[in-house]
Curated annotation (Swiss-Prot):
Natural source organism: Sus scrofa (Pig)
Keyword line: Cell membrane, Disulfide bond, G-protein coupled receptor, Glycoprotein, Membrane, Receptor, Transducer, Transmembrane, Transmembrane helix
Compositional bias per record (Polar residues), positions renumbered to this chain: 14-27
UniProt protein name: Orexin receptor type 2
Disulphide bond pairs: C127-C210
């Protein structure tokens, strides 16, 4: 999670190094033994052209890209269109979606290219910009999840200590982005491009890597330890503690401000005097209990959804966080004989990071009724838009036929109405009393 290499959270650069390739691939020892064009063809065939399992990886990245982009945009649109959804929690969810959109657009394509080709094709400027934006989005996601947990903890466990408002939520979001942009500046400073094939640097950009360049060995270790603690371990521990207390309050204890009746599994209230009919006081007490039950259920649904979001985040970022620490702090994988296995681990870890961005909208869809309704409405509008032209053509084609049928129906209905009127009149006449029958017929 600390940069943009394959060792970094959603890294956007190559984890391989020249010593690794030299120890595992003989052709790199003596590239002068090959003609330049022949050597480049060999590199393309052996390293750059996607293998069978890499096509599966490409398909997985495409699916994640589409789901993450469409899903998170729908989340933002749903909250923007509906005023009743502009709650404090939903403001933070929108901010989380914006961070996911940022990392999906700016970093996912570059990571896929680097994972497949092991080459940074995007130049020195983007070598600094893309890793910086990626780490900023990671920091924004972590801080946003922390603010959500803190807000829910105050609202449920200590409702009288702090009152959260939409204005405070918006101010917190601005602070989150400012802090994230500032603390990730070192990541942009240390990123540099270098080539692993100096002899062919003027002829090809193959095996150009975008990696960190530090002045000493102690600095990268300190940086990555701090990055791991600040952006993963410490926030995760605090959020777990907060949600544990929330779980105890919502599922095991009485929520402050609720009655003991609700706490006792919502047993029905019994009036003291047992009146024959429900009195006004009893009705008001029952209404209050019903409101408390509704509030508890709503809080439980929200807490359950946020706990799942946190759990998925922790699972998706755990592999890359561990691999980064092992690589950067302990120097593992620098000289490895099983290069393909290490490459597979890092590649899968990168995909997991982006899969987290795609998973969040899916979680909202399954665990939030309001978001589910908005997603259905959005897809319904899309489907109606696709079939709108076909329906217009069919409607125009049926116009003449329907008009002819309408004319025939009107004539038929006119005849039927006339016959029905005659039948009703005759029936009413036949049911008249005998004494008045002659007079009625005469008057008619």
């Amino acid at each position: 999670m600390s940069g943009t290499k394959l060792e970094d959270s959603p890294p956007c650069r190559n984890w391989s190094s020249a010593p690794e390739l030299n120890e595992t691939q003989e052709p790199f020892l003596n590239p002068t033994d090959y003609d330049d064009e022949e050597f480049l063809r060999y590199l393309w065939r052996e390293y750059l052209h996607p293998k069978e399992y890499e096509w599966v990886l490409i398909a997985g990245y495409i699916i994640v890209f589409v789901v993450a982009l469409i899903g998170n945009v729908l989340v933002c649109v749903a909250v923007w269109k509906n005023h009743h959804m502009r709650t404090v929690t939903n403001y933070f969810i929108v901010n989380l979606s914006l961070a996911d959109v940022l990392v999906t657009i700016t970093c996912l394509p570059a990571t896929l290219v680097v994972d497949i080709t092991e080459t940074w094709f995007f130049g020195q400027s983007l070598c600094k910009v893309i890793p910086y934006l990626q780490t900023v989005s990671v920091s924004v996601s972590v801080l946003t999840l922390s603010c959500i947990a803190l807000d829910r903890w105050y609202a449920i466990c200590h409702p009288l200590m702090f009152k959260s408002t939409a204005k405070r939520a918006r101010n917190s979001i601005v602070i989150i982005w400012i802090v994230s942009c500032i603390i990730m500046i070192p990541q942009a400073i240390v990123m540099e491009c270098s080539t692993m094939l100096p002899g062919l640097a003027n002829k090809t950009t193959l095996f150009t890597v975008c990696d960190e360049r530090w002045g000493g060995e102690i600095y990268p270790k300190m940086y990555h330890i701090c990055f791991f603690l600040v952006t993963y371990m410490a926030p995760l521990c605090l959020m777990v503690l907060a949600y544990l207390q929330i779980f105890r309050k919502l599922w095991c204890r009485q929520i402050p401000g609720t009655s003991s009746v609700v706490q006792r599994k919502w047993k029905p209230l019994q009036p003291v005097s047992q009146p024959r009919g429900p009195g006004q006081q009893t009705k008001s007490r029952i209404s209050a209990v019903a409101a408390e039950i509704k509030q508890i259920r709503a809080r439980r649904k929200t807490a359950r959804m946020l706990m799942v979001v946190l759990l998925v985040f922790a699972i998706c970022y755990l592999p890359i966080s561990i691999l980064n620490v092992l690589k950067r702090v302990f120097g593992m994988f620098t000289h490895t004989e099983d290069r393909e296995t290490v490459y597979a681990w890092f590649t899968f870890s990168h995909w997991l990071v982006y899969a987290n961005s795609a998973a969040n909208p899916i979680i909202y869809n399954f665990l939030s009724g309001k978001f589910r309704e908005e997603f259905k409405a959005a897809f319904s509008c899309c489907c109606l838009g696709v079939h709108h032209r076909q329906e217009d053509r069919l409607a125009r084609g049926r116009t003449s036929t329907e008009s002819r049928k309408s004319l025939t129906t009107q004539i038929s209905n006119f005849d039927n109405i006339s016959k029905l009127s005659e039948q009703v009149l005759l029936t009413s006449m036949s049911t008249l009393p005998a004494a008045n029958g002659a007079g009625q017929l005469q008057n008619w």
